[in-house]
């Protein structure tokens, strides 16, 4: 008799995705972040569901309802901080996952990569709308500043912003619709993640060498299931350390002040994971130019496969590209730092230089380095 897990219509899908899946024998811990992102998404959906049971999406009661969750609901503080810091862990895993893809040439799986870019945009949109919900000062002003960027779109800009706001400013209508979108988007993300996996399993995983690994495959279970469990335990350890010892480390103190449209905070800034994009936005003095640079800073990922000029897939054997990759990482860290600084003299010029370097590295220097390395292979 054949095993039920190989014949049952539903079990068969699970079996071919997580048990009998042929996986390269040499994938490193950088391949753990896909499963960690899945775990993050599950944590966010579960904690978010319990928060939604007690939250009210009304401008008069939103802030108080979050306070009520933290003070009066059983373990409400834990659920709230797991959700807030879970978002930070989500983005850490996302950035490492994308970085891995860039380093090892995983972007050559075009469908998987492009769905990944769509997923990145969806997660960023979800996180932005979630940040508005507690209705603190930074929630309100962050929503005002970021939605206002759409007014830079010629001709339809102003109408578009007022349509999104549901009025002439960020108000009750905005908060209610942001809550609705924030609730539905994670389920769309989960569906997209399923499609992401579907396309990945059409080709099989990439590996650190970038070479075809068909001749040397091992079953996903038990080798990578146990490896993923270790990754999950480390993720949960870091998350719990954050939540239980310094839950407000990554947050903004301004968000503990209820939203007040009459009082603008001295420094409006988004959560830490958007600071690099915010720095790129601010480094261009023109509004439309800034918005275009902001969108392009993420959308540039979609054209990375077209910029691949190397004869090798991975950067494992390409020292010049490796150097440029780590310069890019350092540049993004500098942009993140600049995004959190006030707009004044040394920070403005540093931000502008870092923004130029970001696009220069991806569009010019890395493709050129790959061509150079191709020529070295001829010697």
Swiss-Prot record:
InterPro entries recorded: Cyt_b/b6_C, Cyt_b/b6_C_sf, Cyt_b/b6_N, Cytb/b6-like_sf, Cytochrome_b, Cytochrome_b_C_euk/bac, Cytochrome_b_N_euk/bac, Di-haem_cyt_TM
Membrane topology, record value: Multi-pass membrane protein
Superkingdom, natural source: Eukaryota
Molecular function (Gene Ontology), one example: metal ion binding
Keyword flag Endoplasmic reticulum: no
Compartments reported by the entry: Mitochondrion inner membrane
Binding site for a ubiquinone: 201
Gene3D superfamilies noted in UniProt: Cytochrome Bc1 Complex, Chain C (1.20.810.10)
Binding site for heme b b566: 97, 196
Cofactor: heme b
UniProt binding sites for heme b b562: 83, 182
Co-factor binding comment: Binds 2 heme b groups non-covalently.
PROSITE patterns hit by this protein: CYTB_CTER (PS51003), CYTB_NTER (PS51002)
Residue ranges of coiled coil: none
GO biological process, one term: mitochondrial electron transport, ubiquinol to cytochrome c
Residue ranges of the TM segments: 33-53, 77-98, 113-133, 178-198, 226-246, 288-308, 320-340, 347-367
GO cellular component, one term: respiratory chain complex III
Further facts: Heme 1 (or BL or b562) is low-potential and absorbs at about 562 nm, and heme 2 (or BH or b566) is high-potential and absorbs at about 566 nm.
Subunit-level organization: The cytochrome bc1 complex contains 11 subunits: 3 respiratory subunits (MT-CYB, CYC1 and UQCRFS1), 2 core proteins (UQCRC1 and UQCRC2) and 6 low-molecular weight proteins (UQCRH/QCR6, UQCRB/QCR7, UQCRQ/QCR8, UQCR10/QCR9, UQCR11/QCR10 and a cleavage product of UQCRFS1). This cytochrome bc1 complex then forms a dimer.
Function of the molecule: Component of the ubiquinol-cytochrome c reductase complex (complex III or cytochrome b-c1 complex) that is part of the mitochondrial respiratory chain. The b-c1 complex mediates electron transfer from ubiquinol to cytochrome c. Contributes to the generation of a proton gradient across the mitochondrial membrane that is then used for ATP synthesis.
PANTHER family for this protein: CYTOCHROME B (PTHR19271:SF16)
Family label: Belongs to the cytochrome b family.
Protein's recorded name: Cytochrome b
Gene: MT-CYB
């Amino acid at each position: 008799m054949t095993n039920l897990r190989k014949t049952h219509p539903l079990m068969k899908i699970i079996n071919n995705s997580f048990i009998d899946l042929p996986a390269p024998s040499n994938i490193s811990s950088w391949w753990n972040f896909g499963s960690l992102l899945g775990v993050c998404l599950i944590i966010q959906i579960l904690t978010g569901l319990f928060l939604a049971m007690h939250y009210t999406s009304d401008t008069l009661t939103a802030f108080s309802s979050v306070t009520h969750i933290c003070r009066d609901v059983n373990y409400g503080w834990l659920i709230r901080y797991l959700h807030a810091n879970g978002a930070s862990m989500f983005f850490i895993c996302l950035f490492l996952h994308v970085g891995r893809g860039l380093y090892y040439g995983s972007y050559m799986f075009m469908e998987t990569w492009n769905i990944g870019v769509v997923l990145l945009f969806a997660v960023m949109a979800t996180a932005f709308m979630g940040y508005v919900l507690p209705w603190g000062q930074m929630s309100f002003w962050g929503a005002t500043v970021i939605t206002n960027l759409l007014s830079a779109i010629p001709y339809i800009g102003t109408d578009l912003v007022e349509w999104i706001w549901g009025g002439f400013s960020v108000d009750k209508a905005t908060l209610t619709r942001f809550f609705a979108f924030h609730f539905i988007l994670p389920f769309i993300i989960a569906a997209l993640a399923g499609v992401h996996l579907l396309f990945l399993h059409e080709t099989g995983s990439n590996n650190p060498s970038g070479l075809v690994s068909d001749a040397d495959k091992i079953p996903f279970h038990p080798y990578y299931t146990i490896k993923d469990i270790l990754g999950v335990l480390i993720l949960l350890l870091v998350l719990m350390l954050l939540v239980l010892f310094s839950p407000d480390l990554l947050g903004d103190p301004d968000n503990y002040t209820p939203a007040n449209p009459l009082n603008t905070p001295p420094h409006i800034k988004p959560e830490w994971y958007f600071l690099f994009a915010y720095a790129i936005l601010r480094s261009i003095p023109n509004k439309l130019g800034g918005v275009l640079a902001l969108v392009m800073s993420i959308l540039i990922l979609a054209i990375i496969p077209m910029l691949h000029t190397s004869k090798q897939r991975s950067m494992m054997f390409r020292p010049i590209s490796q150097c440029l990759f780590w310069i890019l990482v350092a540049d993004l860290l500098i942009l993140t730092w600049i995004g959190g600084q006030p707009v004044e003299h040394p920070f403005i010029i540093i931000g502008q230089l870092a923004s130029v370097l970001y696009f220069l590295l991806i569009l010019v220097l890395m493709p050129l380095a790959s061509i150079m390395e191709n020529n070295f292979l001829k010697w």
